Swiss-Prot record:
Residues 521-527 are annotated as: G-loop. Belongs to the PI3/PI4-kinase family. It comes from Schizosaccharomyces pombe (strain 972 / ATCC 24843). Keywords: ATP-binding, Autophagy, Kinase, Nucleotide-binding, Transferase. This is Phosphatidylinositol 3-kinase pik3. PROSITE patterns: C2_PI3K, PI3_4_KINASE_1, PI3_4_KINASE_2, PI3_4_KINASE_3, PIK_HELICAL. It comes from the Eukaryota. One of its GO terms (biological process) is pexophagy. Its EC number is 2.7.1.137. CDD domains: PI3Ka_III, PI3Kc_III. Residues 14-166 form the C2 PI3K-type domain. Residues 673-694 are annotated as: Activation loop.
Length: 801
């Protein structure tokens, strides 16, 4: 069967300009010239407005459409677009006006219409187009008869056939065309006089082929160039608000503000603002309110940090007023002083005031915050490579305290050693270290401390060399253990016996030698060493020395845990946590206090899945009370309390990757966590609960219905509510750590404080917070997926061994 061939041209290929020409307007009883306007709309774009004036009445209504286009003398109108640029919904908007019969300067509306350039078949209209116009309301009242409609319909049909003939769509037969044209002229002459609707004749360009609409597709650019534009005013304050603030805070209001006292409503607003956590941003209205009542607030020590946040530090007059109020303000607590050392407060006098408040802290209290205070040195006065170091008040304070306290001096030294390895701030911390060494050399006691620190550095270097040698030694674990003992006995390391040396991990302990036979190598990827040291008092001190692990994150967790333990004891709540010690001696090595214990996985394997059996064997109850499950009440109390403490604290810190191999229990029942490689909500496992509380841990308390489990939950609620009271201190400590080179803090440092704050549930009342934590416990115990993960982990450990 022969294929039908249809010749056409796609509109996207037609680059000719789209042109149109006015011909005539036919309407009844009118000889006046008409003014017509025509506008092209293509897509969402409108073209320029074209306006033409011409005589509307044609001399002979019997003329055919093909003859009308020939007698038109108007020029072609160019809309500045090509046919290829026309959209499918492109249309004309046409309106016609004629002079008024009474006043030639006034024009009357004749008609208007919209006319699509592509028909219902997506073909571009060509040749002469006959377009009826919509008339005014008066004309619309006329309703043509059915006979008139039939006549108009017939005329349109004949005109359409003539247009097809003109376009070549119908073959031409000369003798038949002459007869047909005569009949059509007679019909038009007879019936056109009855048509009352204005009709516009427009002449479109004609092409050799039908033009079918087709979208234009642009080729993909190989050389793409992206441009970014920046709004320079995007983050700027509104000038009107700035002007208002200057007027509100004008110095002329100063004398009046001194006598201002808030009413009960404003007092509640101020109390609400002062209760905000440190990370909460104050609105402009809240800042203005704090500033307005600044003199009244000087008697409230909790208001200073909020007041300093409300100061516009670019306004010298405000700065002078704010600084003058510092000395008259009620002395603030240490936790608020820590907030003033955060990156949010950069003015030297504000930071100096914070340091003056730290001077009231005891050495024991200062040790709890020392890690963060070292990090706060970053925000004092950063120095460039060509700038001379000027010690800040904080640096001088830390150095002076370190000279007077060996414990602070020990920790400060090792914190600085680690930070010096961090390239961006190496010069700053090297300068502080130089200042520390320089001040030590000024006194006999100081020189002794300096010699001790130097001996500690050499001691750690020996352990590092031994650890690297063991790691590079080829052989089984047993061979590595034998090789370790040989190295420890080697006289070149001088580790068997030496002069008393404060252990860097715990400077309160003086070690005098090592016991090689009690040392071993753990079966782990990094092959950490377990070393046992002889102490000056005859005791022994076991440690784990790790090379290849960054212990700074673990060090932070244990430091916060130790602080929380102190805070709970102040609230008369002793959870028997006994946190162990961790010290990073470098970016990739450090020491951990070894606590004799067994992992939960080992206990379950050796005691047939029973924590109770493990506790009973190591702590048998001599009494006949069956309520203790045959376990010494002290051991059971240790277990219940420490479980509660670690569950709450690890939840608050978002400790992840919890499994049965990093949950441990000592013989006397102390429960604790190890390996803090994931914190702040990060976890390599899917669907991990917010808190690790396995059913094995609960069964160690006697099960869900035992009184010990109820006691455990009570300890959890009390611990959670007690730590919520100290949330500002914890949040301030984390705000000082946001730029520390710690993996899970660097991961998303902008949200570090927010993640910790979120877990305190500070937006809840105390009763709601307890209900929330109760639900958290229930969800953790009943979670199925962690149990599956624990089983898979145990299987993986078995296969690995």
């Amino acid at each position: 069967m022969d294929r039908l061939v249809f010749s056409y041209c796609p509109s996207s290929k037609v680059t000719a300009r789209f042109l149109v020409k006015f011909c005539f307007i036919e309407y009844q009883d009118s000889q006046e010239p008409c003014i017509c306007t025509i506008q092209l709309f293509s897509g969402n774009e409108s073209g320029s407005l074209m306006q033409k004036c011409f005589v509307s009445k044609i001399p002979n209504k019997s003329l055919l459409p093909t003859e009308l286009s020939k007698i038109s003398t108007h020029e072609w109108l160019d809309f500045g677009v090509t046919v290829s640029e026309l959209s499918l919904n492109a249309k004309f908007v046409v309106s016609a006006w004629k002079p008024s019969f009474n006043d030639e300067e006034v024009y009357e509306f004749v008609g208007c219409t919209t006319y699509r350039l592509f028909d219902e078949n997506n073909l571009l209209r060509q040749g002469l187009q006959k377009i009826p116009l919509q008339t005014s309301k008066e004309i619309k009242k006329y309703s043509p008869t059915s006979l008139e409609l039939e006549q108009v319909k017939e005329i349109n049909r004949l005109d359409g056939l003539l247009l097809k003939l003109q376009l070549g769509d119908v073959p031409s037969v000369n003798w038949l065309d002459d007869i047909s044209f005569g009949k059509i002229k007679d019909f038009r002459s007879k019936h056109m006089s009855l048509v009352t609707i204005p009709i516009l004749y427009l002449d479109f360009l004609q092409f050799s082929f039908p033009v079918v609409f087709q979208r234009s597709y642009y080729p993909k650019s190989e050389n793409r160039v992206y441009y970014s534009s920046f709004d320079l005013e995007l983050n700027l304050d509104s000038p009107a608000e700035l002007k208002h603030r200057r007027l509100v805070r004008s110095q002329r209001n100063g004398p009046l503000d001194k006598d201002l006292k808030p009413n009960s409503k404003i007092r509640k607003e101020l109390e609400s603002i002062l209760s905000y956590p440190p990370s909460e941003e104050l609105s402009l209205e809240e800042k203005d309110l704090i500033w307005k009542f600044r003199f009244y607030l000087t008697r409230n020590k909790k208001a200073m940090t909020k007041f300093l946040k409300s100061v516009v530090w670019t306004d010298s007059s405000e700065v002078n007023q704010a600084l003058s109020l510092l000395d008259s303000w009620t002395e603030i607590d240490i936790d608020d002083a820590l907030e003033l050392l955060s990156p949010s407060f950069v003015h030297p006098k504000v930071r100096a005031y914070a340091v003056s408040r730290l001077e009231t802290a005891s050495n024991e209290e200062l040790l709890l915050y020392l890690l963060q205070l070292v990090q706060a040195l970053r925000y004092d006065n950063p120095i460039s490579s060509d700038e001379r170091f000027q010690p800040s008040p904080l640096a001088l304070f830390l150095v002076n305290r370190a000279i007077s306290s060996p414990s602070i001096g020990n920790d400060l030294y090792w914190y600085l050693v680690v930070e010096i390895e961090d390239e961006p701030v190496s010069k700053l911390f090297s300068s502080v270290m130089f200042l520390f060494q320089k001040e030590l050399s000024k006194s006999v006691e100081g020189r002794l401390i300096r010699e001790t620190l130097s001996a500690q550095a050499k001691f750690v270097e020996k352990l590092l060399r031994i650890s690297k040698s063991v790691q590079s030694f080829r052989g089984t674990r047993l061979k590595k253990i034998e090789y370790l003992k040989v190295l420890l006995e080697d006289h070149k390391y001088h580790l068997l016996d030496f002069h008393a040396l404060p252990l860097p991990l715990d400077p309160s302990v003086n070690i005098v030698g090592i016991i090689p036979d009690a040392c071993t190598v753990f079966k782990s990827t990094m092959q950490p060493l377990r070393l046992l040291f002889k102490c000056q008092d005859g005791s022994k001190y076991p440690i784990i020395f790790k090379n290849g692990d960054d212990l700074r994150q673990d060090q932070l967790v244990i430091q916060i845990l130790t602080l929380m333990d102190k805070l709970l004891k102040k609230e008369k709540l002793d959870l028997h946590l006994k946190p162990y010690r961790i010290l990073a001696t470098g970016p990739t090595h450090g020491a951990v206090q070894f606590v004799p214990s067994k992992t939960l996985a080992t206990i379950l394997a050796e005691y047939h899945g029973s924590v109770l059996a493990y506790l009973r064997e190591n702590n048998p109850d001599d009494g006949l009370n069956s309520a203790n499950y045959g376990i010494d009440p002290v051991a059971m109390d240790n277990y219940v309390r420490s479980c509660a403490g670690y569950c709450v604290i690890t939840y608050l810190l978002g400790v992840g990757d919890r499994h049965l191999d990093n949950l441990l229990i000592t013989k006397d029942g102390h429960f604790f966590h190890a390996d803090f490689g994931y914190i702040l909500g990060r976890d390599p496992k899917l669907f991990s609960p917010a808190m690790k509380l396995s059913k094995e841990m609960v069964e160690g308390m006697g099960g869900y219905n035992s009184p010990f489990y109820q006691q455990f939950k009570s300890y959890c609620y009390t611990t959670f509510t007690a730590l919520r009271k100290s949330s500002n201190l914890i949040l301030n400590l984390f705000s000082l750590m946001v730029d520390a080179n710690i993996p899970d803090i660097k991961f998303d440092k902008e949200k570090v404080v927010y993640k910790v704050k979120e877990r305190f549930c500070l937006q809840m009342s105390e009763s709601d917070a307890i209900k929330y934590f109760e639900q958290l416990i229930n969800d953790s115990v009943s979670a199925l997926f962690p149990q599956i993960i624990d089983r898979m982990h145990n299987l993986a450990q078995y296969m690995r061994s």
